Structures are given as C-alpha cells and as structure tokens.
C-alpha cells in the first residue's frame, strides 16, 4: 500500500467508525455487528501503526464512544474520565499484553490478574457526595455523558445512600437487560407491530434513555458494578478482587462472575471456562475483562488517550454466519397474529443448525429492506433466538424478490385484517389459533400440563376431541386410549396433570388465557388487584388503568376481551369444570376507596409495600393530588411532602403507617 492509499483509507475508516460510534453509543441502533466493528477498528489501528505520520488525537483509536449531537438528557461532565478497553481476540495477543507489562514495569511475569465477565450492556457512572447519590450518567464520549439518574433509580438494586465511603465517589458499572426480559420485551413489541430490539444491549440502552422513567421501570433492567473512579485512592483498597468484594459490602450489585488468574496461561483457563458457560448465563457476555489485580501497578502504568494500560478485553469469538434467505413462510399465532418466518440455507451457529429465522412483523421487514434471495448475516440474539443482523446489500444481483404479505390466512383461508403493522386472522375457528391457544395454555409458565405436547394437541384437534382449552377438562381415559402411542399409564398421567392444573390460581389462568398484552408480571398484577375472575370481568377502564404496568392501549384491549361474549363463555365453561378463578394471594376490601402515595426510603422494598396495599384493596399512585388519602413518608422525602401539606393531605410516618394497618386488622410483615 502506498502512502497516499494509506492516507485515503485511514480517513475513510475514521469517518466510517465515527458514524458507527454514533449509531452504537448515542442512537443505540447499530447497523453492523460487534465483530464487523472490531475488524474496522483493528484495520485502522494497524494502518496508524504502519504510517505514524497520519496519527491524529481525534482518531477513533484515541477516543471513547461518542457525544450526543442533540442530547435527549442533560449533558453532565464526569468528575474523572471514563475509558474504553483495548481488545484481544487470541491467546497470543494476551501473551503479548503480558510481555508489554513486563517491559513497562521492569518485573518478571507471571502477574496476578482478576478476570471478569464482560457484560454486554451500557456503561454508567454513579457519583456520590458524602454518601448521597448526586447523579447517574451514561459514559458518552468518556468526558461528557447524559444524566439518567431517575431512570437508573428504577433499578431497585442501585443504592441511593452509602455509609463509610470517601466523601466524593464515582462507581462504574454496566446496565444490562437479562436475556429473559429481552425476549419478553421483544415479544410484546412484536405483538404490537412495533420495532423490536436487535439484542439485549440495544434494548438496555433504549430502555435507559426513555424520557418517562415509568417505561424504564417496566423493562426489567439490572446493573452490575466493577470499578471506582474518584475515591479509589481514598478507599484504601489494594487489589481489584478486594474492590469487587468492597462494592458488594457497600450494597452494590456485582452480578457478573470473576476469578483470580496467574499469568496469561491462567487467564486462558478462566477464559475457556467462562466461554463454555456463556449460554447458561442470564445476561449476554461478549468476552472477559482482564485486569492486573494489584492497584499499585495501575498507578505505575497509567493510561493511553483511550484505554488503561493495565487492562484488556479478551473477546469471545463472534458467532455470525452469512447465508441466503430462500423463502418466507407465514405462521399464525394464538391471537391470530401472522408472523413472517425466513427460510434460510442451513448454517451452524453456536452448536446448532439454523434454518429458520423470525422476521417479526412488517415494520422489521421494511426497516431491513430484506428480500427473498438476499444474502444475510445471522446470529443468535441473546444467545438463543436466530436473528438477521443485517442484509448484505452489496451482494445483490437484481434477482431478489420483495416479500409479499398474504391477503388470506395461510391456515384457514379467511381474509386477514390489518391493525397498524400487524396482520391478523379474525376467524375464531382458525385451526392454527386453536392449536397455539391450547399449546400456550398448557405451557410450563401457564397451567403447566406436563405431557400435553404439540403432537398430542394436533391429534386431539384432528379427532375433534377438543375445540378449545375448556374441552381439556372433559377428556376421558377412553378418549385418550384411542389415540396413537397413548397407553394406559400415559393416559392416566395426563388426566392427573389436567386435574392438577385446575388449582394453579387466577395469576396463572390469566396468563394462560392469553389476554392481549398480558404476560406473567401483568397477569400477577391483575390477579393481585382484583382477586377473582368475577371482579375482573366487571372492571372498568379506570380500574384497569390503576393496575401497575397497564397503559391505556393495553387497558382498552383487555377490556374489549373481557366484554367479548365468546371469552365470557369460555370462562364460564372453565369455571363449571372446576378451574380456580381466585388469586392464590389473599385480597380484601379492607382499604377499599383509599388512595396512598409513597415517598422517601422505606424499611421494606417499595414494591412490596405497594403490593400489600393493593392486596388490601387500596389504590397506590405516583403523585399527590386532592384525591390522595394518605402520603406515607420514609427517610429523605422529596417534594411530595410539601405538596401534601399544601393540599391538606394526611401524612403518615412509616411507623404510623404500620400502626395504622395493624389497627385496621391488616396482616403486617414482621
């Protein structure tokens, strides 16, 4: 490569990487995979090393992240800079890292390291003064981030107050979305025809940057902490391992794995072990972070413009494969929603063959601009669900075909209806809807009918033995014995499981019946609020809106279903069959008609107190108004206390609150 060619390629790479930094760090909507980004950055770094005359302090190799062009939140300067990490992809690069340490420190290796999971989330910085949280911010460009304090405080494990810490303290960590929460969120977004997230990291970033903290609170975010900025010297800590234990002791969640390792060989052993456990983790990890354990050596080594010299990110191999989209088929779910599924040329990803991939909904297809015949880059989102990362448009030949949505249901032939970006089959007798409804009803998280698998459901429907879930409770042993591969013992076991499912409670039943927008959490909230199916069936829109996590669209959809004669008939038949229609949690009318607001820090988790009040029939709201009956005040109350006094609302200290409940005859936690 000539000098001029190198200059042009370096400038091209810098522009490209800056663009992708903005997509990743600011918009939380990357266009390329992590592996592709790493390749671009490595190419730029190698060219800058070969042609040092073109190095520049504003190069992406010398900078961290990206600063928002138009901040959604208030920009805030970090008291001390937040750095990125240099990457290693092979054992040889880890060995080279240790050799650099040996030369820089003038000491013989091996060195002692702490090796930690590299959680794939969003880096944040918490700043405390005299033990009180002042703000929480995203990393941004390392010097200036966005203040997201209120959204961070929706993560219940983040402490607001600390004891026995330096007067000024920065605590650094990662906000992430557990894989289970990510899959659940995407399912809800897909059901509504909205844009889904590509991976848990994007979902975490998008959720943390919501303007409304109540939306953030519903997303199931978690956090794990691993570093100090300001206050590290004053802490008196001697090692990274000790620092992690100190963070735990002070009440910070340290949810990632970590181990000590001696030398590059020891690091490799831990890396291999963590890699093997990767898909058993509740979060996405894209590698390990290797840090010298001795903090005194950190001071000797210092930092480059971009990263510490004493630490390294040792990345897991990227499991991304190129393949072709051969066709698209359409599947019908239990609500009648039609989902496009891509048929791929089979590829092997993370231990299994992938030949199908969900294309979610019309919004997703339009955004990707994906066509039949396209080459695509595929990975497993959350290490579980095959997903298209991007379309390789540069490989198009002109023979690719656009995806056409069917006008009629692929299962029953009924004309589809379109609701926003969602296509649905409205036919209540559609066999696919019946199959999916029964399969969902019997699933482990719903009524948990062990032995009622997909093949058996198909046979029951084919033979006309069941039409819907209520028919399950009228099956007889002789009905089952007439089915292929069904013996006496299997039939008895299945009937016993069906009988046991009658007693799962209203929480599980509401989830099992597939009310629109109702997942496990919302089903539990509805059961807790109303207590019985009869009460729920008579609920008004206003009452549904009082339930935690119910927005107006969901409330209207639930209400429409509750008023549907077919749904009411199904509930009646289930009730006649002996299925429990009551919550397993006791609900009373003891505080019916009263409205509570909670403020400040209580001795028990706020959600627990809120749930208790709701079980006693009270309404719990977030803001004080003239309709508020009582404001319950914990330590460090906010402006709600002043507003309550101005409006003449009754105020209870926490001690008075528990005494009030006892006097009412309510069960009070010990």
Curated annotation (Swiss-Prot):
Entry binding sites for NAD(+): 34-38, 84-85, 116-119, 139, 174, 226, 291, 315
SMART domains listed in its UniProt record: BRCT, HhH1, LIGANc
Domain BRCT: 586-670
Regions that span the bilayer: none
NCBIfam families: dnlj, PRK07956.1
One GO BP: DNA repair
Enzyme class, broadest EC rank: ligase
Keyword annotations: DNA damage, DNA repair, DNA replication, Ligase, Magnesium, Metal-binding, NAD, Zinc
Domain of life: Bacteria
Required cofactor(s): Mg(2+)
Pfam families per UniProt: BRCT, DNA_ligase_aden, DNA_ligase_OB, DNA_ligase_ZBD, HHH_2, HHH_5, Nlig-Ia
GO MF annotation, one: DNA ligase (NAD+) activity
Enzyme Commission identifier(s): 6.5.1.2
Any one GO CC term of the record: cytosol
Active-site annotation: 118 (n6-amp-lysine intermediate)
Annotated catalysed reactions: NAD(+) + (deoxyribonucleotide)n-3'-hydroxyl + 5'-phospho-(deoxyribonucleotide)m = (deoxyribonucleotide)n+m + AMP + beta-nicotinamide D-nucleotide
Coiled-coil intervals: none
Family: Belongs to the NAD-dependent DNA ligase family. LigA subfamily.
Protein name listed in UniProt: DNA ligase
Alphabetical list of CDD domains matching this protein: BRCT_DNA_ligase_like, LIGANc
Temperature dependence per UniProt: Optimum temperature is 70 degrees Celsius.
Biological role stated in the UniProt entry: DNA ligase that catalyzes the formation of phosphodiester linkages between 5'-phosphoryl and 3'-hydroxyl groups in double-stranded DNA using NAD as a coenzyme and as the energy source for the reaction. It is essential for DNA replication and repair of damaged DNA.
